[in-house]
Amino acid sequence: MSDINSNSYDPYHHPQQHQQESQYHPQQQQQQQQQQQQQQEYYNQQHQQESQYQQQSPPQQQYDNHQHHQQDLNQAHNSGHGRSHNSGHGHSHGNNYSGLPHLRTQVGHAQPYFSSYNELNNSGDISNSNNNNNNNNQYNYNNNNNNNNYNNNINNNQFNSSVYNNNNNNNNNNNNEFSIDGKSGITIKHLLNNLNRDSDAKKLAAWISVMLVFTIYEIFYGAYLESLGLVSDGFHALFDCIGMGIALLAMLVGKRGISNQEYTYGYDRWEVLGTFSNGCFLLFVSFFLFLESIERLLEPPHIHNHGRVMSLATISLIINIVGVLFFKQKSNERKQQSSIRSENLLTISHHILVDSCTSLGVILSSLVGQAFGLEISDSLISIIIACIIVYNALPICIKTSAILLQTTPDQLKININNAIKDILVMEGVIDVTDKHFWSHSPGNIIATVNLLTKKNCDDFTLTQSIRNRLSFVQDLTIQLDKEGKHNSHSHGGAHHHPHEHKEDKKSHNHSHGHNHGHSHGHSHGGNDDHEHGENCDEEHEPVPKYQVQPTSPFSSHYTDIHSNNTPIPLYKSEQDDEDDEDDYDHDEHHHDHDHDEHHHGHSHNSSHSHAHNH
């Protein structure tokens, strides 16, 4: 026992033969030699398996761990390890193997173990202790094996975010193929279907196509004739085609008419936005047209070959007049429906009208220049055209901008005020605390109304009455707040209570200043009685000099109490000791502070200053 447990004992080293070996029977020595050979073969086999194990995948390693574990148990059981030489040659085979403990490293392969002669042939206590150690080793091995299996399962079944994101992106790409913004579900196929079903959009697309072809021809032909008027009219028409293309896109997208997670109110605002941008584009064109006209007034250009210029401008004028008449008629038809389509078509007709005016200006300037040689006629007509554009486009920009800014519609302000007055006189209504009215698109009004009502108010009846009164609102949200309902709030502060007591019996004035600071975070309850009677002498226990004055701002002159109700003597200054020597009387003053059954979420730190004037 002492040999094994000593510091010099080495289980991996075979000790020298000593006296105990001479007592062994030759057969026992032969058995021991066979056991050593088996151990050496086992070590070589494990070393070979280790090299193969490291080349396998994690699932195969996990499977081999289990197979190696079973082989180790069977081999240890068959080799006769774990014997207990308590008496005679009895053997006890169980789960505790002293000869071959199954220790594995992090990768799961078995480690060699060499038992000595003393370890194999010692007393029962030694064998039992070895068995206990092997029990611990076997337990550690099982834990390590379970951890390895768990880690392998995690590695094999772990969530791969990159694969998930790729699959999700593929699904989104399939759903939103050729999507305009990538997330709204507006595809080219959807736009083509709307174009096929919308007669206004179909005619606008046809007109834009014809006008675009003619505009490109006008630009190149004007450059060939060196006519600045034709080139300017061509670029002006090109910008108008771009603006009308925006209006066409707004018409097609706004036709969708349904909502989703991205556009919870639907797509009506697309057409509003397109109309607003189109009006702003008209103002931009009129501004530069005005600048160009001023420049041509100062330096009139010389136009060559007025006949060809007039013929090309006449063709452009005819196309524009047809477009103005058509879209103006459509705008009047839609105006009766109070829809944004009317505003959009009106803006388009203004675009075409501007093109018609510019074409007419080119024709008139060519006639005047050819007949009278007056070159400034083109510039004068261009200024008139710019003023007409501003007159028509500015109200459209103001109206659509008001919708985008969610202002209250002007035509509904009177109805809204009358409705609010009627709601205030309804049964159970105390006040209208908040109200919002705005237009999502022309003819689509949205509103939210918050009311303060009485406690016994019938919410359902009141809500139905309000909805009937605000029937002109398409999307109405009503919130009712009961009377006496307060929102939770937190408060804090410092209170200063000055008290001054004057006594007639004695010329003795007392002024008490109470300063209470509140710091939240503690709850306290107690019963504090302070009584001041006649000839009340206050005596304070002297404080040892080694105590230091407290520097905390929360210190006070009251006695603090531990959790076990033990009073703690507080610190006092020298001035307090001098004040304690004075005897003062308090007549007819009784202060009673009762804090029973009140739990406050704060602690009171009070400082009382006493000034005595004798």
UniProtKB/Swiss-Prot annotation:
Domain of life: Eukaryota
Membrane topology of this protein: Multi-pass membrane protein
Gene Ontology CC terms: cytoplasmic vesicle; Golgi apparatus; membrane; recycling endosome
Pfam families: Cation_efflux
Topology feature Cytoplasmic, residues: 1-203, 255-270, 328-351, 399-614
Bias-annotated ranges (Polar residues): 548-567
Compositionally skewed regions (Acidic residues) per UniProt: 575-585
Classification via NCBIfam families: CDF
Job of this protein: May be involved in zinc transport from the cytoplasm to either intracellular organelles or extracellular spaces.
Protein name: Probable zinc transporter protein DDB_G0269332
Organism of provenance: Dictyostelium discoideum
